[in-house]
Design a protein with these regions (language model features):
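Long, contiguous, secondary-structure-rich segments that constitute the structural scaffold
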Residues: 39-57, 61-173
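Long, low-complexity segments enriched in small/aliphatic residues
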Residues: 1-44
């Protein structure tokens, strides 16, 4: 046999810790959407029309249990932070899992939080030990969260095409 199977349950897991699982019953994973490259293009109106705000993918039965409808703003909270995202209710995700793409809002660059602390999934992730013992990475995926319906979107973000303006930061000469 060339390869030996290896699996290690994540440090935060409903399988490992019942107390945490009760408080944070969902597992967060994250990835990328095809409209943006790393942290770029969120200032381009055409791209924001395609993917205007961060979305959280939620399985329909889970959304219903939390009183969340498609398009509702949702609080997403881990042990490390709390952000908001818009609900995308879909059968394209497992019932115990939610998924988000990292996001920031360049239109709020002049605010105290520079437009990322309200909606960026990285606020929720872990960057301290224990690390993945095989490759030494931080836990950027597979950590526990809870969700609840939010009253509104974060203040000052573009949500509709008529809000979008091409924006380019200008450096000082």
């Amino acid at each position: 046999m060339l390869f030996r199977s290896y699996y290690l349950e994540p440090v935060e897991s409903p399988v490992r810790d019942d107390d945490t699982a009760r408080e944070y019953p969902l597992v967060m994973t994250n990835g990328r959407v095809p409209f943006y490259h790393h942290s770029t293009l969120r200032n381009a109106a055409a791209m924001r029309e395609l993917y205007p705000v961060p979305e959280i993918w939620i399985y329909p039965d889970v959304a219903k249990a939390y009183g969340i409808a498609p398009g509702d703003w949702v609080w997403v909270e881990s042990k490390r932070g709390k952000i908001r995202a818009k609900a995308l209710v879909t059968k394209g995700i497992n019932p115990g899992t939610v998924c988000m793409e990292r996001f920031w809002h360049p239109e709020t660059m002049n605010t105290k939080t520079h437009g990322w602390q309200e909606t960026n999934v990285n606020v929720l992730s872990k960057s301290t030990a224990p690390f993945n013992d095989v490759v030494g990475t931080h836990t950027l995926r597979a950590y526990q969260v809870r969700i609840s319906k939010a009253d509104s979107a974060p203040e000052g973000i573009w949500q509709k095409p008529e809000d979008f303006v091409n924006w380019l930061p200008l450096g000082k000469a």
